[in-house]
Amino acid sequence: MAVFVCARCDAVLTGSVERVALPVCAHQKYGHDLLPALMESGTYAVDPEPAGPPWRPWSEVGAEEAEARGVFAPEFSLSFGAPGAVVVAPGDTRGTVLIPERCDGYCIGLDGRAGPNLACACCGSAVATRIDDCSYWQAVWLTPGAVRRVPDDGPEHAMTDWEALAEQHQGAPPIESCGAWNARWEAAVGAALAHLLSVSAGARVALPDGVMEETFGRALDALLPPGPTRRRVVLAGPGLPPADEDIALVPRHPRTGEVWRPPGGTAAVPLEADVWLHMAFPCAQLPVPVTGGMPEGVFRDDPLPPYPWRLFRPDREVFLSTLARLPAVREPWLRGIYDRMRDAPYACPF
């Protein structure tokens, strides 16, 4: 556990928080609704990539310098700000005040366009950026260099082992009560889709029927050329029986970010743990009580399970950002997919 303090005056800026993996949806933009908090209360994550100004266009950066930073396909621009921004839930901040002249946003909240908009209440130093505008996950991003991490005496949670993953973490339902697809699912599948394409070698893959086909199938049909399926994708991970297949969809540990490794030479495609858990261990509604039966003349009036009002669509921006950071994107067939998707933002094939 740790707290973050002002680097200038040592005032405490957060409650006691524990480090977890950065969610793949951290920089996702979704619809025009207010989104909930990105981070669970009592947790923080670190973004290893540079963030914020100055920005340099791709034409100025060049492929060689970009590859040295782990970006293997063109992006509009790259940040040359400081890496290591820390993100916490808004409710975990302490001793900060808004900077009124920096409280700009696109719609009905703050989006950080004017730079850090939270100051230390003790010394006035700009220390963080509050994000709560529509389309963004609500979060507070602590500015690298303006804050300092201090170990805390709070209880340290034991690192979750793989075998206890299903017991200590819950799966996220794919569909919201309103019938919209869960934004975290769209981001998670978008990131996993990039990895799945990179290990497919450009050949069609077979998916099991059900939620995997519903979430990955349309995108793979649109992006891979027609032809016979050469490889099969299955769910694999802790709590599931061993599967002898070519490609395994495996969980990414929610605390460490470690990817579960299947035995042998099976290619692993990482998927966010909350999405993987729902795919691997779906919670089905029981048709009758666990014990006994329904009394005579009594009918169930439970609401029907939510049904989506549109087809599933992996998040395009998360997909492209993930694909640009995979060395395999330099292969001509995969680079062609990336270029087609990037150059036609309003003509998404799936």
PLM segments and residue spans:
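Intrinsically disordered, low-complexity regulatory segments enriched
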Residues: 60-63, 167, 186, 190, ...
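Extended, amphipathic alpha-helical scaffolds
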Residues: 243-350
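Extended aliphatic helical segments
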Residues: 3-5, 12, 17-20, 24, ...
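Domain-exit/linker segments immediately C-terminal to small folded modules
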Residues: 74, 81-82, 102-265, 269-271
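Alpha-helical structural elements
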Residues: 50-53, 176, 180, 271, ...
